[in-house]
């Protein structure tokens, strides 16, 4: 299988940089997979789990929004937050979800809609983390 270069960058660190076979990305308009030779485009990310496939092994990384650019040079993702499953503190993640739920009653209109959407994404990530497929 042909490979391509992939960079995953967050404000804190370079979370990944290297040659990969495939990257499955949680896009705002729907999830998408990237292989070598993919057509160029730019997409926004939603909070979700990014899957990086290299040599038959998969690495799961949680991203909490950002921007993806596919070009002839490869795939670059600028993520708001990028945390590997190994680094994730699931208790802190659950606490974050509880805090988001508690603050919903303080929001109205579009702000409430965005908060509910973000909470739904976080709950989906939590549900995926609790399945045996990710362990």
UniProtKB/Swiss-Prot annotation:
GO terms for cellular component: plasma membrane; proton-transporting ATP synthase complex. It holds the Pfam family ATP-synt_DE_N. It is found in: Cell inner membrane. SUPFAM superfamilies: Epsilon subunit of F1F0-ATP synthase N-terminal domain. Keywords: ATP synthesis, Cell inner membrane, Cell membrane, CF(1), Hydrogen ion transport, Ion transport, Membrane, Transport. One of its GO terms (molecular function) is ATP binding. Transmembrane segments: none annotated. The keyword Ion transport applies. It is a peripheral membrane protein. HAMAP family: ATP_synth_epsil_bac. F-type ATPases have 2 components, CF(1) - the catalytic core - and CF(0) - the membrane proton channel. CF(1) has five subunits: alpha(3), beta(3), gamma(1), delta(1), epsilon(1). CF(0) has three main subunits: a, b and c. Belongs to the ATPase epsilon chain family. This is ATP synthase epsilon chain. The lineage of its organism: Bacteria, Pseudomonadati, Pseudomonadota, Alphaproteobacteria, Hyphomicrobiales. The gene is atpC.
